[in-house]
């Protein structure tokens, strides 16, 4: 349900509860609690819970600025509309893998959705040493279905162009264009890294091959409106348990390249692998890298054979060349994400949480090496196992 209110105002814990009661999403009770639990950079997230009914609710509100910077970095509130619309679209294909949306309000920039507090954020769980045996199965299914069915392969071209317009997301794409594809490759003011990494960062900035390949990847990101991508699919955007997975926070959603989400997810698996002590502890992450690609291919190929409206989909070689291109581009995007999460704005906690300062710096240098390798060699990658081999090679350098 979408309802327009008169004007925007930042919610508080008490006004979030009042809104939920007014909408009939939760009953007024002395047993209600509300806590602002948002740990991201762009939003408030209110967890409302009725302890008598044992029923919860999430109300998420977009802020008109980035919390990580402050009011000097204004942001559009339209991203709340994008997020709720993306969740609803994704739920058409994978309802079991995204939170249910109960209500959205474009003026308040609010989305009310399913409470997932019985699950945990995957990044936090991985840092704590937990394993999620079905993570790559579920993420691979999510990617295979959502990326296929929102593309030209399954959507009438005229309707797809309407979706491209609906999900045009210039402000948040601008963040990605700058923070992932531009600033980390130059001595930019937004970059954030330890002084011990300066030499490695300067070597990256001076590497002309890296610059040329990063420019290629940025161009692909800017110009390839292939499918509805999540836009920020890292391990901090996934809730999970041993049996269940939910992908959240698609406020960066837009029509972009097939490989973008895949590359982001894989990069963040490798970031966690770098925080592990040895290859034995890393192996289940390597398995997820290989399996998420295998599952994506299996799900995508099944949809291709059953539901493609593209005349040329009768060609098996067209499918294989499509997969080959997606994996190559995903590898390059993973490389850019590795660089960004190491020396750019908004690090990955996986590396920042390494207790030993010397070990932390060493693993960040390895992350930069791996990122450069992926960027330079993305055209040569043929299998997901190649990515694991490149990781192992970078660790030894």
Swiss-Prot record:
GO molecular function: ATP binding; S-methyl-5-thioribose kinase activity
Pathway in which this enzyme or protein is active: Amino-acid biosynthesis; L-methionine biosynthesis via salvage pathway; S-methyl-5-thio-alpha-D-ribose 1-phosphate from S-methyl-5'-thioadenosine (hydrolase route): step 2/2
Keywords attached to this entry: Amino-acid biosynthesis, ATP-binding, Kinase, Methionine biosynthesis, Nucleotide-binding, Transferase
Gene3D superfamilies, per the entry: 3.90.1200.10, Phosphorylase Kinase, domain 1
Reactions that this protein is recorded to catalyse: 5-(methylsulfanyl)-D-ribose + ATP = 5-(methylsulfanyl)-alpha-D-ribose 1-phosphate + ADP + H(+)
Record flagged with keyword Hydrolase: no
Enzyme Commission (EC) number: 2.7.1.100
Catalytic class of the enzyme: transferase
Residues given in the record as ATP binding sites: 43, 60, 114-116, 249-251
Name of the protein: Methylthioribose kinase
Source organism of this protein record: Bacillus pumilus (strain SAFR-032)
Gene name linked to the record: mtnK
């Amino acid at each position: 349900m979408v309802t327009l209110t008169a004007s925007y105002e930042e919610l508080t814990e008490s006004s979030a509860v009042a809104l939920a009661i007014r909408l009939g999403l939760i009953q007024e009770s002395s047993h209600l609690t509300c806590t602002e639990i948002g740990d991201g950079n762009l939003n408030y997230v209110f967890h409302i819970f009725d302890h008598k009914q044992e029923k919860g609710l999430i109300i998420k509100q977009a802020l008109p600025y980035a919390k990580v910077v402050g009011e000097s970095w204004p942001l559009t509130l339209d991203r709340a509309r994008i997020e709720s619309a993306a969740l609803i679209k994704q739920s058409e294909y994978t309802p079991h893998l995204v939170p249910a949306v109960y209500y959205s309000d474009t003026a308040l920039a609010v989305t009310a959705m399913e409470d997932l507090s019985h699950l945990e954020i995957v990044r936090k769980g991985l840092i704590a040493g937990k394993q999620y045996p079905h993570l790559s199965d579920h993420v691979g299914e999510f990617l295979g279905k959502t990326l296929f069915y929102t593309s030209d392969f399954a959507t009438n071209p005229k309707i797809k162009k309407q979706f491209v317009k609906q999900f045009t997301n210039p402000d948040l794409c601008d963040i990605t264009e700058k923070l992932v594809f531009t600033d980390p490759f130059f001595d930019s003011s937004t970059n954030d890294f330890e002084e011990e990494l300066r030499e490695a960062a300067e070597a990256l900035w001076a590497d002309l091959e890296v610059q040329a390949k990063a420019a290629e990847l940025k161009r692909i990101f800017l110009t390839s409106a292939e499918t509805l991508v999540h836009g920020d699919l890292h391990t901090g955007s996934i809730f999970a348990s041993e049996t269940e997975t939910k992908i959240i926070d698609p406020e960066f959603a837009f029509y972009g390249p097939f490989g973008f989400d895949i590359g982001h997810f894989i990069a963040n698996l490798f970031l966690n692998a770098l925080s592990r002590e040895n290859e034995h502890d890393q192996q289940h992450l390597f398995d997820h890298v290989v399996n998420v690609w295998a599952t994506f291919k299996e799900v995508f190929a099944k949809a291709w054979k059953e539901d493609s409206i593209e005349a040329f989909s009768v060609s098996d070689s067209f499918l294989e060349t499509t997969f080959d291109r997606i994996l190559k581009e995903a590898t390059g995007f993973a490389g850019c994400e590795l660089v960004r999460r190491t020396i750019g704005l908004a690090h990955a906690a996986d590396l920042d949480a390494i207790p030993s300062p010397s070990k932390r710096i060493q693993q960040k240098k390895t992350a930069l090496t791996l990122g450069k390798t992926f960027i330079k060699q993305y055209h040569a990658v043929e299998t997901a196992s190649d990515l694991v081999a490149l990781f192992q090679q970078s660790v030894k350098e």
